Amino acid sequence: MGPRARPALFFLILLRTVAAQGRPPRSHSLRYLFMGASERDHGLPLFEALGYVDDELFVAYNHESRRAESRAQWVLGEAHSQLWLQLTQSLKGWDHMFIVDFWTIMDNHNHSKESHTLQVILGCEVQEDNSTRGFWKYGYDGQDHLEFCPETLDWRAAESRALTTKLEWEVNKIRAKQNRAYLERDCPEQLQWLLELGRGVLDQQVPPLVKVTHHVASAVTTLRCQALNFYPQNITMRWLKDRKPVDVKDAESKDVLPSGDGTYQSWEALAVPPGEEQRYTCQVEHPGLDQPLTATWEPSLSNTLVTGVISGIAVCVIIFFIGILFRILRKRQASRGAMGDYVLAECE
């Protein structure tokens, strides 16, 4: 894995982690992803930023251009010029903050002469009841490093090497209060503004296409429930046995991933006893559905036909051999009868 792949992989893991932390249906999120490299040989600028609303990329910025650039049609237009002015100013400020933090972390690691990467993810979620949750995390060289705790205004170190930076940043209470104000006030306000701009696009709801497939490998029978082409990505999938929930520990689930066309996909698999497939049902809940959708595995016509043909051939083969055996027995009986008559006649 190359140097650039490591921060990209780190961001992918962070996105999944944040999304997996209990996001309820119909919630919305605003995320900013920052990354940078101390040397150009990593293929990254000193600072690069990407902004997402509900996991839809809408803005990009880098240290060289120092300008916010649109990545979505719904934020284009002269009417939104004020938005881009504010975004550019905010990202310039984060550009400066990121570089200062980068040098601080490198100095605390005695890495000033080496090439390293820094990654940051920050943002907020607004739930259906208008409650909010903020997050602000740092990763260094592709590993979790520091996380801001807005409730206590301190930093949580993910590794021992981060303790020096943690103690240094916790002295600056002004910055901690500014961070909390952004996560709890500014970020939710900006998210609501962006949701208004993206009305009709961001609030669309495409229900999932759900199907259950059957797989047999190494004497293990597995049912796989697939949810395809849905939007937004908030979805709940569970297995039921005789209409009762199955323990989640028994199921294997896949993270919700983009399909490449603006929709999402996911699946959940469950190993079941052979012959009991019809006792299991996949239940799916999604904002695009008026009520939970259920699906079961239905044997395909081709499988039924093949089974019938094989069974028919087997029956025919059995009947054929029984017929041959019957004829052989008849011939033997006839031969024995003829021999008996011959002997009796000779005795007379």
Curated annotation (Swiss-Prot):
Region feature Alpha-3, mapped onto this chain: 206-297
One record GO biological process: regulation of iron ion transport
Extracellular side: 23-306
Transmembrane segments: 307-330
GO cellular component: external side of plasma membrane; extracellular space
Family the entry assigns: Belongs to the MHC class I family.
Function, as annotated: Binds to transferrin receptor (TFR) and reduces its affinity for iron-loaded transferrin.
Protein name: Hereditary hemochromatosis protein homolog
